[in-house]
Regions:
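Charge-rich, intrinsically disordered regulatory segments
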Residues: 1-109, 119, 407-435
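Internal amphipathic alpha-helical repeat/solenoid segments
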Residues: 2-6, 69-173, 350
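Acidic/serine-rich, low-complexity amphipathic helices located in mid- to C-terminal regulatory regions
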Residues: 80, 85-86, 93-95, 99, ...
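Cytosolic regulatory protein-protein interaction regions
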Residues: 108-111, 115, 239-374, 378-401
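Hydrophobic/aromatic-rich effector regions of fungal transcription factors
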Residues: 113-119, 129-142, 152-195, 205-211, ...
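Start-of-helix signal in alpha-solenoid helical-repeat scaffolds, especially tetratricopeptide repeats
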Residues: 128, 178, 222, 226, ...
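Short coil/turn connectors between adjacent alpha-helices in alpha-solenoid helical repeat scaffolds
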Residues: 140-149, 188-201, 238, 282-285, ...
Length: 435
């Protein structure tokens, strides 16, 4: 008895042969069986079949991975597990870009990463200061406990005291102490703590700056000096006192056109230093009427233009500079520094509107806004209409959401408290940290 040979059916045969369970010759355009029977030979669309099978396989894999942690690709290095290293990592990847107005261009590194972060490898003092600032920022983000930030801050303060008690310090040690003192000011800014504490650190930085005798100035020293000058003006305005002077120098002398520390032009900053000095003298009861008129004229004549080809970062710097100019004029007017008849209420309204527009433009650009606290505070205090106040609160909210620094929340609370006063005056009832 002969055994019937089992035919091997092809997976790629025509539809007729597959339905009749016959082996297909797979001839094109018609197989042998369909040709003999005189019927239409139809082959399936294998592209659709393959896609369907692939999609089904993908679904099976997805179902198998439900509830299982899947590592997603990332452009950033994995976050270190060590706490201290994690704080350095946060400062490097997040915080440094929030407190600097460096241009994101090739060959223009962030100055904090260039002049501060490398010092953490050789100086425990700078390391603790950087970690304290980063931990404070993470605390505000809800990613770290407040106790950890406090511990690191205490370590940085203790090391600072120990180092300063030494009878002699070399140049490297002094620069590390200077970097640490300035970072501790940022610690107060991030947590919105005390303008007085920040002023104490500023006074320590002043002494260290005065000890420097090297000429020409190395780049890191120029960077530290600019940070000092920025906080010198902002803290003086916060506390309504006169700025500090370095070796009797009446004010900053910057040569660069655009500055990466405070996003302002160098030609305007000496005028802001003069403004802080006059406001401080006025709070002490001094007569500044003549000098304030001169400063107002200089502020009115100062200008900076932007072109259609200006990139967003440069445009933000321009608008920040303009907001400082107009808020400086508003402060002089509100402080009663000028009673000249040529300054009318209409002019005040025009200056206010210009300051308001510049602050709003910076917000719309959605770039680093770290130096916007003071002009936003000034414009906010003068906002009287419901619409303007609504916009101001929106800018504060966006500012806080972008930077997550309590100094912004403190300024917002002070502005809202000012609005609630029955007859709000310009004088601050308590120091407001601005920086």
């Amino acid at each position: 008895m002969s055994t019937r040979r089992q035919e091997t059916r092809s997976r790629w045969g025509c539809m007729t042969c597959r339905s009749r369970r016959k082996k297909c010759s797979e001839g094109q355009p018609s197989c042998q069986l369909c040709t003999e029977r005189g019927i239409e030979c139809i082959y399936p669309d294998w592209t659709a079949v393959k896609f369907s099978q692939t999609r089904q396989r993908r679904r099976q894999l997805q179902d198998a991975n439900i509830g299982r942690a899947v590592a997603r690709p990332t452009l950033l290095p994995a976050q270190p597990s060590n706490h201290e290293t994690r704080f350095i990592f946060h400062f490097n990847t997040i915080l440094a870009s929030l407190i600097s107005f460096s241009f994101p261009q090739a060959g223009t590194p962030n100055p904090f990463l260039q002049h501060v972060l490398p010092r953490t490898a050789s100086s425990v003092q700078v390391q603790y200061a950087v970690e304290a600032v980063a931990a404070a920022h993470l605390y505000h983000l809800g990613a770290e406990s407040g106790d950890r930030a406090t511990q690191l801050h205490s370590k940085a303060l203790n090391l600072l005291a120990v180092e300063l008690s030494r009878p002699q310090l070399d140049e490297t040690s002094r620069m590390n102490l200077l970097a640490s003192s300035l970072l501790l000011i940022y610690y107060e800014i991030v947590l919105g703590n005390s303008a007085s504490n920040a002023w104490c650190h500023l006074q320590g930085a002043k002494v260290l700056l005065e000890c420097h005798r090297t000429t020409p100035e190395p780049p890191f020293f120029s960077f530290f000096r600019k940070i000092f000058q920025y906080f010198n003006v902002m803290l003086a305005l916060s506390l309504e006192r006169r700025p500090l002077q370095i070796n009797g120098d009446p004010g900053p002398d910057f040569t660069d056109h655009m500055d990466t520390v405070f996003g302002c032009t160098a030609t305007l900053w000496p005028l802001m230093h003069r403004l802080a000095d006059l406001i401080g003298r006025a709070c002490l009861g001094g007569d500044i009427s003549n000098e304030s008129k001169i400063l107002m004229d200089r502020l009115h004549s100062w200008s900076i233009e932007s072109s259609p080809s200006t990139d967003a970062y440069t445009e933000a710097m321009v608008q920040i500079a303009r907001s400082y100019k107009y808020c400086g004029l508003l402060m002089l007017r509100q402080a009663g520094a000028s009673e000249a008849p040529e300054y009318s209420t209409l002019q005040d309204e025009q200056i206010y509107r210009s300051a308001f527009d510049s602050v709003l433009r910076v917000c719309v650009l959605s770039l680093p806004m770290a130096t916007l606290t003071w002009p936003l505070y000034v414009v906010g205090k003068l906002a009287s209409s419901t619409s303007d106040r609504t916009v101001i609160l929106h800018i504060f909210s966006q500012f806080l959401e972008k930077h997550h620094m309590m100094v912004v929340d403190g300024a917002r609370a002070a502005v809202q408290a000012h609005w609630q006063e029955p007859q709000p005056g310009w004088q601050q009832s308590a120091p407001v940290l601005l920086g």
